[in-house]
Amino acid sequence: MDSTLRRVVFFSNEFPSDDLKELFRRLDQHSKDRRFRLLSIFLEESTAVLKDEVSKFPRPLKELVPPFDSVLGLVDVDFRQGPLGAAMESSILTILELGLFIGHYESEDTEWDLVPGESVLAGLSIGILAAAAVALSSSLADVAKTGAEAVRVSFRLGVYVADISTKLEAPQSDGTLSSWAHVVTEMTEASVQDELKQFNTDTHSPELTKVFISAADKTSISVSGPPSRIKAAFQHSPVLRYSKSLPLPVYDGLCHASHLYTQSDIDFIINSAESVILPDRSVRLALLSSQTGKPFIAKTASELFLEIGTELLTGTIYLDNVTAGIVQHLQPQSKETSSWQIDSFRTSLVLRGIHSAVEANLSGEQRQLIRRDLVSWVNRDFGPRRPRSYASSKLAIVGMACRLPGGADDLDLFWKLLEEGRDTLTTVPPDRFDLNTHYDPTGKTENATQTPYGNFIDRPGFFDAGFFNMSPREAEQTDPMQRLALVTAYEALEMAGVVPGRTPSTHPSRIGTFYGQASDDWRELNASQNISTYAVPGGERAFGNGRINYFFKFSGPSFNLDTACSSGLAAVQVACSALWAGEVDTAIAGGLNVITDPDNYCGLGNAHFLSKTGQCKVWDKDADGYCRADGIGSVVIKRLEDAEADNDNILAVVLGASTNHSAEAISITHPHAGAQKANYRQVLNQAGVNPIDVSYIELHGTGTQAGDAVESESVSDIFAPVTPRRRPDQRLYLGAVKSNIGHGEAAAGIASLLKALLVYQKNLIPMHIGIKSEINPTIPKDLERRNVGLAMQNTPWPRPAGKKRLAVVNSFGAHGGNTTLLLEDAPERVKIQGTEDRITHAILLSAKSKKSLQANMESLLSYLDQHPETSLADLAYTTSSRRMHHNMRFGTSVSCISGLQKALRSQLDNPNFASEVRPVPNEAPSVILAFTGQGAYYHGMGRGLFTEFPYFRAQVQQLDRLAQRLGFPSVVPVIENSIEDTPSSPILTQLSVVILEIALARFWSLLGVSISAVIGHSLGEYAALAVSGVISTADAIYLVGRRAQLVEERCAQGSHSMLSVRASEDAIQEMLAAEPETALIAYEVSCCNTNQDTVIGGFQGEIDDIRRALEAKSIKCTILDVPYAFHTAQMNPILEDLETLAKAIPFKAPSIPVISPLLATVIYDVKSLNASYLRRATRETVDFAAAIEATQDMGLVDSKTMWIDVGPHPICAGLVRSMIPSAPVMSSCRRNEDSIATISKSLVTLYLAGLNPCWAEFFKPREREYSLLHLPKYRWNETDYWIPYIGTWTLDKAHLKHGTKPTTPFSVSMSRPSALRTSLVHQITAETVRTTTATLHTISDMQHPDFLEAIHGHTMNKCGVATSSIWSDMAFTVGEYLYRRLVPNTKDVHMNLTDVEVLHAQVASKTKGSVQPLVLRAHLDLSTSSMSLSWFNADGETGECAAESFATATILFEDPGAWRKEWARLAHLVLGRIEVLEQRATEGKASRLSKPLAYTLFKNVVDYADRYRGMDSVVLDELEAMAEVTLVPERYGTWHTPPHWIDSVSHLAGLVMNGSEASNTRDYFFVTPGCDSFRLLEKLEPGARYRSYVRMFPLPEDPNMHGGDVYILQGEEIVGVVGMIRFRRVPRLLMDRFFSPPTTTSVAGPVPPLAGATTKCHDIAQTAPALPTPTPPIVVSNPIVSSTLASKALEPAPLLATSSGDSTPKEPPIVTPAESERAGPVDNNMISQCLRLMARETGLEVEALTADASFVQLGVDSLMSLVLSEKFRAELGVEVKSSLFLECPTIGEMTAWIEEYC
């Protein structure tokens, strides 16, 4: 503070010439920065004062004040020009001047410098109130408090004056403001007073309304009075009429009117201010009166405000007096006064006059007049905002992801779609619902849609269930919106580089999810067709967010919001609010919409929301409604300061977000311009942004007449007003993404936001394609004049240098909600260019499946090929520190991009990649630290870590300070390599090694490595003991240093030496003893490092002799570079003193197990660790080898245990590897290698073993130098979990109100025409055809005459059973149909039907008139030339499709030429075998069967109808046979290939298995579960002759299974092959169980399982993690036939429930007398019988059926379970469920159960 400075602070009664709103915006923006803490407090207090005062208004006045959250809301032009605007001017001016005053000081960060006596305050009119707040303050903090009370007084004064004045003269009816004061120049006060007196007299003016002088000086006079009276006065007086006069901006009424106000008025204003701060406050600074120019005499605040109030209301302003008072104050008081300063708020005529007067009066002084502007600071940029609170923060969007129509499954594809101006309009795909039945443009069909159009995402059902820990059943039942919310949330988090817990802002407890969703199509339609366990968690909206939180383990809030069409952006707004409120630190937000339900189409259409003509025609004159769309989008949002601290990529910044409601609209669905504008103002005020600065708006833009008109009005009025107009360079561009991708409803807002974010990234506004004809005439006509319009072509949107672009995103809800988001550019990031010391970098990739890992590697390789400039360091940072890691892993350490590409290609080119890659274990392997001895010492050890990692450096320096305080030399020069390259003293050597090792151990802990045990080699044992907590770090350093001193003092250097010998201790002794010259040489074993690595010590000469002797025997020997022979007798002189020193040291139990090389054991307690231990460890042998063996013997170590060598060079690592060759060993440092590269490689090894290093710490020291790369997203291992809507029940329910019963959906669909209809394929229910893919769903009725006849042609157990040839024909039918849909000009389609697997036989119902539907789903992919097929049962009443398929297959579309070549090579072999069979039949060695005989043999299992009996004769020789075949000429229906023809040429294999003497057909029958392939070179011909040949053989992997190839020949040529057709042996007693007709058409139990059904052991473990108590048996005499699926046998039996719902198992039921013989107590005889029966049926010995033997291990699968349950019933009379063998998984549990219940 300059004591020689005289100062005046002048508070004007006029606003600065700047834009008032902009000044307040800047104040508001600065107040959110922690630099301006007091400014923020003042503005908040002032706002609170105004709200308090307004709350006291009477209702009529209160209604004139709009709601406001800050003063900024009251500065709008509309309000200031309103009825109360003028009255508020005084308080607004007070707030402005005080805010600028406070902000000036805070911007300069200067101390309070207003000193009483040296500083004086002055002001005019209302400005004196602001000055009064400063006069009452002794600090800037005081001004923030007193200022709010000054605002209160000014507010009350302004309102009071306005109220009194309006009683004198009413305001203009049109709202025009009139001035209450005029200024007259070039006249004296007396002459003006004479004219006014004459006017008042002549017009007989009442005293209250007279015109009077309110202010005067030498050059001007202010005349005040009611506006009309002033006008009349100037017209009445010729002198005034022709004088120079101007109206003043005084609109609030009359002040300075002694005739109007009395002391009671003043008391009412001042004394009712209800201040709690000011009564006891005294005046600190002189404040000059604007009437007298002298300081007010008041001593207290209340006195001061009364004086000021009196002057403002009754006193006249004399500016000359004010000027004189200022000049007098500035007169030099002493010779030390060097300058004068006048602080003001900009300049004005009054202020210039004061400046002139001061300069004139002080012109003779050799001093300087300083003019300081208190406004200029407000426009300065103070750098990045440092938010004062969460609410003051800007927000950063750091990640995003999407699934949008038009194939926009990622952001690049979405942008490409926008940039190309594509329209994604299409008709409703068949997989959603059938337009043939649900579309009626006339509107006559109830519940039908009147529009067929929409915009749909590709593959909505595809999902990686395994990744998200969901079973296929749960995934299928889970709403695709929820699934894709999970997927896009992950992708957005991945893009953002979020690793939960990496930083404080990403701690799982501080992450929340916010999603908008406005429909429940999947739950209400698709999943409701078969309500299952997962109906609620899979369909209820709350679970969408909850599932994200649960999967990622986020414990922040989880909100699912429905605000209709604005849901997505409203969810973002709520997320922003949560961030501003401090409820979360990271938010994931988005919108969800997947359309499936035709009901919603119908409802929206009937409400006239939807266009009947197509896409959303935004701003088009023909706009007729919106077009529906799918959409899923997710964004990740943080507070800006957190995003910058986390080194995130910031896509854009959110300045403000708000949602309001159109409460005043004409109807609930009609938009309201006023509400929209209010919302814009709220957002702009929240951010302190000028609407003119906004240059892009993404409209809600639905393409409705009302919506477009209202939004165009609201947008133009706020962002492009008529005045002030936008400059030519301030073009406002508009866009509407709905014209491209339709209206995504709940996802619409998030789609708009994603587009806006991409616009920021690409610096380009995509073309608007919504205007198809001409612009809508309801749009304002003057938009172009306002410089606003749609971007009709791709328009560059460059970022101005040094500035930020502003954009707005709108989203409105049909219910009346309006949500608006205000965005700005991300801060320009200047990447710190450091010196890249890291030469080697770790690149990591991971996945949850092998397929995904491979795809991730391929995508990264592709990315690198396309971006060869990629920084390896950035790539390493991104793939390690900024990724969530999974159990399938790839990792490598490389030094260049080309090296990485080579490593990736090497892995991808490996044909065994899939088999070699293995998931890391769920439980990471243990890690052991091995601390080396001093032999690894060298200068500069650990230097790279010391330089690069502050944490490591701090640890070394901390330990070094301890060493120095203990009196030892500093080791830092050794590590820095700043010491001379000369041999170091033992003290420095040993301390350096130990300190380095302790620091390294702590560094490994920092990197997230948990230690399981430690082992130290010689000197390294001190570090190991310190790290394990046995001794303190200081004690370890002390003992090592003192030991080294003792060695130097007591032991002679060079007298002894140590020799490392590559041989065992025994071998050395034997070799030395064998030679006379060495037999008596004395030496000691210092170390047994491994079984073949020994260190000996002794006198130097003797050790040299030993070395020569051993080397002569070709034994590798090395003299160690140590000055002493440790662990020998040379150490004896120090032992006593060392032990004495150690006895003073406290020893504690190890916190980490210590592996002792001295004791060759693992130490867990403190008993063995003491001073004596250290003495012995110094003197005795280091038996490292025995210690390692002990760890193995004790189970502490196995082949997977990780070993980290902690020391300057990996010596212990080599020893461990010698002892355990398979052990993974790593290094911390390595001589002549960059230590950072060494650590990096070790971390990769740990990572690949299953540990999760803390990569964030590894990159933390230089994180600012790295950039997060936007790499290709995770590649999902997806499966289609789509449940199609079957039938027309949404239409049929309309009949219920008429009392009519709707027909079943299936029968309705059967009656409709279909593009594909054959005898087996009856109706297409869904069809989607895209460029390279196609999907088809069909439905068929097995009771249809054609189908039923085909089934009854193949009967088993007197039941019609569908033969595999039926599935073959259906597959070929849909295969050719779909292929021709994609490749229409194909001449012939050749199909290879592969991987046919029939899990459950289909038995025709015997109920007449029943419906027995089945569904076939097919998906063709041209890129792989393959088509997958699945068959499902469906419910005959509801059309509900079963959750699981009963049969599957794959068709490969192949070149028949390859078949022909393949078969040509085989033909001679097959023909040769046929000839052999013929010859053996002729010789009587094989059986020749006639047609009747052959089919009679077949009747053992199957009875064929005549049309199926194509074999004319058969030659059968055990498991080999050939047949002559003639096909019946009749097709008997419409087929691709008639089943009776397929069966005729192929069922020879069935005859071999069921008719050959080689098969036990008495006890067993054989059925086929499928084949590997079925190919026909040409279509079978009616009446044609063929030959079939087959040779069956047992399959080694399954003794119950046979397989073989059936060759079909025409002449000498093979024309077809059924490859590896399989037959399973089934006990004949299960015939009834498998082949009985269903009694119901429910999908819950359509048919029994086919004998070929199998379940793997691991499937059992997955499906039944916990088993309930087994159900007791029911002992009955008659069999109970189960109709459950085979898979049901593997499910736990439900507990018996009581009527009250109790799930406690019931007691066994009472049995009938006939049953009672078996119902009594069961002795061990029953157990024995059960075990013998089981042994017989499984082929095992009874001895193998031990109590702990599991049925899985014994090979008791689902089929064997059925056999055993039947045998138990038939032979033992005990009825048990086959699931018993799952519920009781071991023999012991089963026998215990039998004892309990049998």
Curated annotation (Swiss-Prot):
The active site is at residues 565, 700, 743, 1354, 1543. Coiled coil: none annotated. The modification O-(pantetheine 4'-phosphoryl)serine is found at residue 1758. Residues 1486-1632 are annotated as: C-terminal hotdog fold. Residues 1721-1798 form the Carrier domain. Residues 1322-1632 form the PKS/mFAS DH domain. SUPFAM superfamilies: ACP-like, FabD/lysophospholipase-like, Thiolase-like. Binds 1 phosphopantetheine covalently. GO terms for molecular function: 3-oxoacyl-[acyl-carrier-protein] synthase activity; fatty acid synthase activity; phosphopantetheine binding. Gene3D superfamilies: 3.30.70.3290, 3.40.47.10, ACP-like, Malonyl-Coenzyme A Acyl Carrier Protein, domain 2, Polyketide synthase dehydratase. Multidomain protein; including a starter unit:ACP transacylase (SAT) that selects the starter unit; a ketosynthase (KS) that catalyzes repeated decarboxylative condensation to elongate the polyketide backbone; a malonyl-CoA:ACP transacylase (MAT) that selects and transfers the extender unit malonyl-CoA; a product template (PT) domain that controls the immediate cyclization regioselectivity of the reactive polyketide backbone; and an acyl-carrier protein (ACP) that serves as the tether of the growing and completed polyketide via its phosphopantetheinyl arm. This is Non-reducing polyketide synthase nscA. It comes from Trichophyton rubrum (strain ATCC MYA-4607 / CBS 118892) (Athlete's foot fungus).
